[in-house]
Regions:
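HotDog/MaoC-like acyl-thioester-processing domains
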Residues: 28, 33-40, 44-82
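C-terminal helical subdomain
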Residues: 274, 292-335
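A glycine-rich helix->loop->beta "capping" turn
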Residues: 145-148, 168-181, 187, 226, ...
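Substrate-binding pocket helix/loop in short-chain dehydrogenase/reductase
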Residues: 190-191, 195-200
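Canonical Rossmann dinucleotide-binding motif of NAD(H)/NADP(H)-dependent dehydrogenases/reductases
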Residues: 83-116
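Active-site helix of classical SDR
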Residues: 214, 250
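Residue(s) in the substrate-gating loop at a strand-loop-helix junction
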Residues: 234
Length: 335
């Protein structure tokens, strides 16, 4: 988690130095970690501009001058005119009433997609009766800018809820091309205080909820021979985070879900990938430091996610970290 955050802070520094106020022009960043960096260690990034649109960089420990990150490459420039489009595509985004889900839904609609905005309207821990307002507000925002969208208020934690989300897409737009499993809740407790109710509530939304929506959507995609599915994992699942055994277990389980689903979808041109976002949202507002929240706008996760949802995406079964202007891939290896 700390290495991922360091990567994000460095990317932010590169953007401020080379393309201030224009983070959307960041095109590519690559590097190699040479030494372990511990929480609280100060860092300094050295940048050499090699040519227009390109720079090399390295990061050192500002206290000891030890090399932390080497072989850094940063490329930047204007966005290509042939932008990724989703004309005539139908997308479902769960948990889309605010934060990341809203950002996904709005940008998909801007680029031509017809969007089902699913949001139960409950609180961060999933409690409460829910309210239609969050989903309706996002739908209104999309329609006001000339896009097409419908709201859905079903709870993905139930099989019927998942079926109804997909049914909403079929009834409104006739099909499903894209599914972003984004809905989530938190019930943080240390293991000795983790009651079955809190364990199951988190599993039911994150893991079971993704299954409840993905299965009916996958059937439609397989029949038509096309689909893009996004799972959402977390550093808490890949590396652990105190007090989040339920959340971490659910989030890493989604990686296993992806690994098998990519095989089942291969013959039908269904790509399944996973995003590990760092973004300011109702789930992270009291988890991430205030300084990180200010630099972690949900919109900075959107480009990677939308690319994985597009026809251009050639990969399936990968995990991508996204946030704070930086993108990288996480891979599990043996040996």
């Amino acid at each position: 988690m700390h290495g991922l955050c360091t990567h994000g802070f460095v990317c932010r520094g590169l953007i401020e130095a080379l393309i201030p106020g224009e983070p959307e022009k960041a095109r590519r960043m690559a590097c190699r970690f040479s030494k372990t960096l511990y929480p609280g260690d100060p860092i300094k990034t050295l940048i050499w501009k090699t040519e227009d649109g390109s720079a090399v960089w390295r990061t050192i420990n500002a206290k000891t001058d030890e090399l932390i990150i080497d072989n850094g490459i940063f490329e930047y420039g204007d966005i290509p005119k042939d932008e990724v489009r989703f004309d005539d595509r139908v997308a479902i985004v769960t948990g889309a009433g605010a934060g990341l889900g809203r950002a996904y839904a709005v940008e998909l609609a801007k680029r031509g997609a017809k969007v089902v905005v699913n949001d139960l309207g409950g609180s961060r821990d999933g409690s409460g009766d829910g309210a239609a307002t969050p989903a309706d507000e996002v739908v209104k925002e999309i329609k006001d800018m000339g896009g097409e969208a419908v709201a859905n208020y079903d709870n993905v934690a139930t099989p019927d809820g998942g079926e109804n989300v997909v049914k909403t897409a079929i009834d409104a737009f006739g099909t499903v091309d894209i599914l972003i499993n984004n809905a989530g809740i938190l019930r943080d407790k240390s293991m000795v205080k983790m009651e079955p109710e809190n364990w199951n509530a988190v599993m039911n939304v994150h893991l079971n909820g993704s299954y409840h929506v993905t299965q009916p959507a996958f059937k439609v995609m397989r029949e038509k021979g096309y689909g893009r599915i996004i799972m959402t994992t977390s550093a808490a699942g890949m590396y652990g985070n105190f007090g989040q055994t339920n959340y971490g277990a659910a989030k890493l389980a989604l990686v296993g879900f992806m690994n098998t689903l990519k095989l089942e979808g291969q013959k039908s041109n269904i790509k399944v990938n996973t995003i590990a976002p760092i973004a300011a949202s109702r789930l992270t507002e009291d988890v991430l430091p205030a300084e990180m929240l200010e630099k972690s706008k949900p919109e900075m996760v959107v480009p990677m996610t939308l690319y994985l949802c597009s026809e251009r995406c050639p990969v399936s079964g990968n995990i991508y970290n996204a946030g704070m202007g930086g993108y990288s891939r996480t891979a599990m290896m043996t040996g």
